[in-house]
Amino acid sequence: MHIVNHRQFGEIDAYEFGYGPVGRPLMSVYVYVLDGVIVDTGQSNMRKYILEQLRDTQPEVILLTHHHEDHSGNAFALGDCHRVDVLGHPLTAQKMAAKRKILPYQRYIWGKSEDVNVKVFGTLVESAHFTLMPIHTPGHSKDHTVYLEIEFRA
């Protein structure tokens, strides 16, 4: 079973994707789209639905919050499909380039992320209407990053 929902928060589109190999999904993941920026790419087990939902977006860049499969599972596919760079923290770049092992339950629930060339973000990530400042927030993972919107331009 799967979940696909779309919500809008002002200028931000939030897409919820959940996958359950048996029955209702136990958890879901959000992919955010704001003004040419995709934040996170969801789990690879939901690739068909994610690519379908985001096919008409025209991203300029993809940002990853961290390397976990449920957030990075379609980084390669979306980057390749839209011909855009994938950006993240230096640790995210290192992990996403390596042939890393994942636990069997992770592969079963989320699928495996493909290796992808993640470029390290700069001090700011700018789009036409947003200025995002990456802030390293280790805890959930050593590479976890949040993106603070510091200058919205209507």
For each of these PLM feature ranges, what is it?
Residues H2-L54, V146-A154:
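Conserved beta-strand hairpin/beta-sheet module of binuclear metal-dependent hydrolase folds
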Residues K48-E126:
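Active-site HxH/HxHxD metal-binding segment of metal-dependent hydrolases
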Residues G10-G18, P104-R107, A128-L132:
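Short Pro/Gly-enriched beta-strand edge/turn motifs at strand-loop
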Residues V37-D40, V61-L64, M133-H136:
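Short catalytic-loop micro-motif centered on adjacent basic/acidic residues
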Residues Q43-S44, E69, T92, G139, ...:
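Short, glycine/acidic-enriched loop or turn micro-motifs at the edges of active sites
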Residues V22, D115-V116, H136-P138:
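Short Gly/Pro-enriched turn/cap motifs at secondary-structure boundaries
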Residues F9, V33-L34, C81, S127-H129:
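Short, well-ordered coil/turn elements that cap or connect secondary structure elements
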Residues T131-P138, K142-A154:
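Metallo-beta-lactamase
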